[in-house]
Amino acid sequence: MKTTKIYDIIGIGIGPFNLGLAALSAPIADLDTLFLDQSDEFNWHPGLMLDEVTLQVPFMADLVTMADPASQYSFLNYMKLTGRLYKFYIRENFFIFRKEYNAYCKWVLGQLNNCLFSRQVVSVTYEDAVYRVTARDTRSGETNTWQTYKLVLGTGTSPYIPAAIKEKSLKDVIHTSQYLNHKDRLVQKQSVTIIGSGQSAAEIFQDLLPEVKKGMKLNWFTRSERFFPLENHTKLTLELTSPDYIDYFHNLPEVQRKYVLSRQSILFKGINADLINQIYNSLYAMGLNDEAHKVVLMANARLNDIQEEDESYLLTFLQVEQGETFDINTDAVILATGYKYVEPDFLTGISDRIRRLDDGNYDVRRNYTIDETCNEIFVQNAELHTHGISTPDLGMGAYRNSQIINQVTGRIVYAVEQRIAFQSFSAADLPVHLKSAVDLTL
């Protein structure tokens, strides 16, 4: 079925970023939007929905607050209307539970009428100045086509599993994103090995530590030089997730951007320092009961190979600094290998309208567009290489959505802050009195 109606925006994918865009768009009478997602319902990282695990950003990083603090879709309004605001106030903690954030997002969805789930987009074409988005209803099999002037791509990132491992299809080798789906089976194993050193790896390690008392041998290896703490909670470092720094980073040459990003991974891929301390305290307590010997932690250990052996796996590592290889046996492997953006296949029909850099990545302009006109195809969380470490940050989602809405409507619907950082990033931004010409006659 094809509709004749033309939307102002069709968003593909309904994660937190496009959901925030849907919520911020809802009150705008002259902005007609539709959002599609292939999942049956909204569920944010269900495989990592561990009890008492919190977001790494304050609650103001909800779907709308940083764009419109008075929005009916704010987290504080959610708490008020669900009768939990005073409990939240007494708790005195800016960092909300991940389960709480997921419930909040579902609450917002329940008030919107511009989001459709179970719709798998199969193609996008361009004709007569409009984009045609065709999606299949995953429940009925029916196909529908909608038309729009603008696209917002919010399909997000996908779990990354190295190709050499993925092609082997090993039963008890899973990605962290699927942890809770397999936990019942994992806790029955005699030995489990976690590979990787980010927040998810640490959360799962801490979650499995109690199983050591029941006999499990638990290993944690990472190729990183150490188990790095997340270093973005100091105030001046947090200014790297600001409009000021996005401007600075975006204006750097492509080669320089790659270099800078390679040095900033611990700013968004490290482990919460409190969690590291909790893990150490748990290990210390286990040592009192002579149980710590069942736990192995090692940095500088790169996984080189994995082979299936009967009901277990033989893992071959390289100790990077020593240049020595070693093998271990384990019954299960949990890969904390992160996430990567995968370009959707449905973009093939409009590939001629998308700008690219020399390496094939999107050439994302400062206003988050990737099309030749710089005004039609926007991206969410696909611009790490052009906009820097603020890209996956929930706290910057409302800022990016404000930019998109203002661009699409041609007016300032949501005020956007220009300068918020105390520090200067570019030499051109230094105060005038510091750049006075030197008097060469002295």
Descriptions of predicted regions:
Residues 66-99:
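A conserved beta-strand/loop capping segment in the N-terminal third of enzymes
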Residues 1-40, 44-46, 88-199, 203-442:
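Flavin (primarily FAD) cofactor-binding/catalytic cores of flavoenzymes
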